[in-house]
Amino acid sequence: MKMGNYIGHTSEDGRQQLLIDHLKGTSLLAERFASVFDAPEWGRMAGLYHDIGKYSAAFQRRILEDGPRVDHSTAGALLMKKIKNVPLALCIASHHSGLLNMGTKFSDVTDGTLMGRLKKELKGKLDYSVYRQELPEPVPIRKAPAFLYGKDQFYYSFFIRMLFSCLVDADFLDTERFVNDGKVQRGGFATMQELHDLFFAYYATFGKPTTPINQKRQEIYQQCLDAAEKEPGMFSLTVPTGGGKTLSSLAFALKHAIKYKKQRIIYIIPYTSIIEQTADIFRNILGDGNVIEHHMNVDYDKDYDKNYDDDKKEDDGLNRKKLATENWDAPVIVTTNVQFFESLFAAKTSRCRKVHNIANSVLIFDEAQMLPEPYLRPCIRSMGELVANYRCTAVLCTATQPSLETYFSRIGEGLKVREICPDTQGLYGFFRRVTYRFMDVDSLEFLAAQLKEHEQVLCVTNSKKDARDLYQLMTGDGCYHLSTFMYPAHRRRVLAIIRQRLQDGLPCRVISTSLIQAGVDVDFPVVYREIAGLDSIIQTGGRCNREGKQRTEDSIVSIYDLPKPMNRIPAFVRRPIEITQMVAKDHADIASAESIKAYFDQLHYTLGEDQLDSKDVLKRLEVNKPAFTEIAKDFKLIEEDSRTVFIPIDDDLDNQKILAQLRSGVCNRSILRKANQYMVGVYENQFRKLEETNKLEALEFGLYVLTDPAAYDPDTGLVVNMEDGIGIFL
């Protein structure tokens, strides 16, 4: 084959991409991505040599003559090993399969580790040496980022993840550009300065605050602006519910991003309902195209074989869909704890590609007390690493701040957490607007009767099953149900109706899972909350007398305890309940700062250090040969796998247009973002029952559509088996 005629990809319409063009294009992108954390040469080399196995005659026969499949990714890894660059060897070997386990010198060629793959390549003796006609010989990189020297292995493994993300995203983007013949609609986002100006112009329309509550919110806002001038690092924003954290934290993020040249703002939030509301607020202020709302996850890797060849025409359908996976390239991202932290510890390419875009960002961890206890230490370690070595600023933003400073202080030289609003006691006193009381409830029927005595009332349950069963006991005008079995656009419509009825003084009785308890802007005169962790109870209390229009003693949050066998309640739900009961015995005011501190201190003490990293993630990453694949499998904030189901709506033109595109095989990032508004997450066992009863239509590569209209209730959403009823939200 003549020099310059080596092919990297082919398209469905017969076009060919020269291999050298793909290598150079990927190299330029990966170099730019890695320069954010002072590793441009590492990114450049990863991109330039990642596909040199395609120079082999065997691969060229594969792509031009439909020959047998060829492993083309191990060749570049072997070349990197020869210059003693193991991180690049691992990234290149893994760029299709996902991050491999490192392995050891004793690894077998069949075990799937990097060392095993390299042995296999040596035995196979695939000749790709003609790469020298178009590429220079690689030379050792003399300089690594300073933060890697003299550190433990966690720094090293995190650096590998960042490099891998740079390579995978660059590879996907360059391939996407070719597949779409250069017609890729990317970028076009507003600059951070433009977003800054949009926000402050919007905020100026509020005028001078006239009520005591709005004056206090203005004080908090100003403290956030003042703190934004401070050096990047770790901050906390401890403000009770109703203090205006959402806009104040955005003001901090925008001003800080301008001053310190941060490339994006990422909000990390525990509940989809808060994500939906927060993203709506930001889109209204900053423009729809500048904000990505990312929570549902379509996993194309489930159907992506580790020996997959992305270069043949018959594979282009799957390839296009993988290319459409989210990479967080917008200036403002609103996502979940699950998406954020599982991506940081992921192995699959579609989840890892976004990780490098976290670097040099302002990270707002809303409701930081919801960080999952079984993974608290690895989550904190990764947050600390992003702040210490990847130019991030992080804000722990909550109404009930857990005691996390101790854990951050153990990272490296120690990260100091700076409180933006230091008068915590004063703020708790000012924003106290409800009275908590405990009550006995012997049945859902009794509870329903209690709720019917109120014209406007909110009741929050611990499980989707109880929420649905209780709702079905309620009758009459103005009764509403909320849970994540309702697709996001459905929940938005119901919340809009609820807000309007509350404003108009009409009957409004709402039964909800805990999705409503934090960050959702509603104001009820009376609230009922099933007993839960103290932070959850106080969050729910924030939906009562939010604007201070009633006397505190008249605004009752009733905490009820339904009789249930404790051995049937999962430990992660039971433990916070028991600690709440302990704290309530010792503290007359369960919502005081002292009570909250006592609750979190006891919770973390009860769990113990080991249970704050229940899968030994940190220990396994602090060894010389980390097992990336196994760690990714074990790092699951939601233990049970979930699937997403698209809900067709006959009278919704946007919904039908999206569905038609999905059925025709059209799939890009824009379509997936729109489709998210009509998707419902279900656990694997619930998914199987829908599948077994022929209620689903399987589209390509992991997408499913509900086909039975009766399986989606217009009031309560997707009808599935409710036996596993504890409410967990993606």
Model segments located where?
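Inter-Walker segment of RecA-like/P-loop motor cores
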Residues: 287-345
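C-terminal helicase lobe and adjacent C-terminal extensions/tails of nucleic-acid helicase motors
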Residues: 88, 387, 446-454, 460, ...
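Conserved helicase motor
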Residues: 8-13, 272, 292-304, 462-465, ...
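Interdomain hinge/linker at the junction between the two RecA-like core domains of SF2 helicases
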Residues: 399-452
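Conserved Walker A/P-loop ATP-binding site and its immediately adjacent core
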Residues: 262-286, 295-298, 403
